[in-house]
Each structure stands twice: as structure tokens, then as C-alpha cells.
Amino acid sequence: TDFNEITGYGYYDGGREKLEKIYSQIFGAEDALVRPQIMSGTHALTLTLFGLLKYGDTMISISGEPYDTLKSVIGLSGDSENSLIKHGIKYEQIELINNDFDYEKIVERVKKGNIKLIELQRSRGYSQRKSLNIDKIEKVISKIKEINKDIIIMVDNCYGEFVEDKEPTQVGADIFVSSLMKNLGAGIA
């Protein structure tokens, strides 16, 4: 019955529901969206950010500069009227130090308040740094949540799936975003 004909509207789609349940169990998450309509990692990140943030909210990247494609979504490059910044969302960035988080700056900034979402990019992207391992991710999430448990922690986990024993949602991340175009961890991020 998982392969029954469907309308395309998502009603009574047992196969999709089962697939998403499997994904949520594998990644230790409350729920999962696994959809062919989400075309890429950047598309998934865009949907997530616009779904979680609204006018006046502040987003902070704690792993330095994001991927080039995400920069235009945020409004750091290009001149899109549809960027987060053009929609009134504030963006801040904290750089990594020696392939690790700047824990002191992060803690200091979190204590100041007025943060809706903290984003971190697990893979190195186009930079020369190493990918962030799960222990570092767990440590920084723990420090943030000790100060403010209501801040949403979002991990850009593209290229990070199945490369370690735990996933970001298993160490305190509220949400992680990934791409099915990438080979779920078989790449060399």
C-alpha cells in the first residue's frame, strides 16, 4: 500500500508518511519533512529560515560566513527584495577560531538576549576549515541552552549525515536541515 496511486496533494499518502517517520526515528527527531518538492539544501534552508523567522527577529550564524548560495537568501550578497534582511530580519555573525566555536563571544552575545535563531554550518563549505564534529556541536548547544533554552538552534547538516554516531538533533539541536541531493554523508565534507 505504500506505493498506491496518490493525487499529489499529500492526502492519504501512506508511503510519504512512513518515509518521514523512518527519517525522524533515524535522526532522533520529533518529525521530518522528506519531500521531492524541496529541490536542494539551499531550498530547504530557505524554507526553514522563512518558516521560523519573522520581521524584527535576529538570526546569528556562529560558524562564520555561510555558503555562497545562502548569502543571497540572507541578504549578504545580491540585491534580492526577498532576502531575510529585506524582510526585516537582523543578521549577525560570529567567526570560528582555529576550527572551533568562539565560545566566549557566543556566550557573551547570548546573554545580551534578543536572539530568535542560532544557525551553524557543520560542513566546511568552500572555506578551508575542517567540518565541525558532533562533540563541538553538542558543547556549543549546551552552553547556549544553559543561558536561554528558547533560542532555536538550527544546524545546516548538509554533508554531515551519518558521518558520526550521533546527529545534531540527538545532541540538543532543535532542527537540522539537510539535502537529499547530497549523498547523505558519503561526500568528503
Regions inferred by a protein language model and the residue ranges of each:
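Conserved PLP-enzyme active-site core in the AAT-like
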Residues: 2, 9-14, 31, 39-189
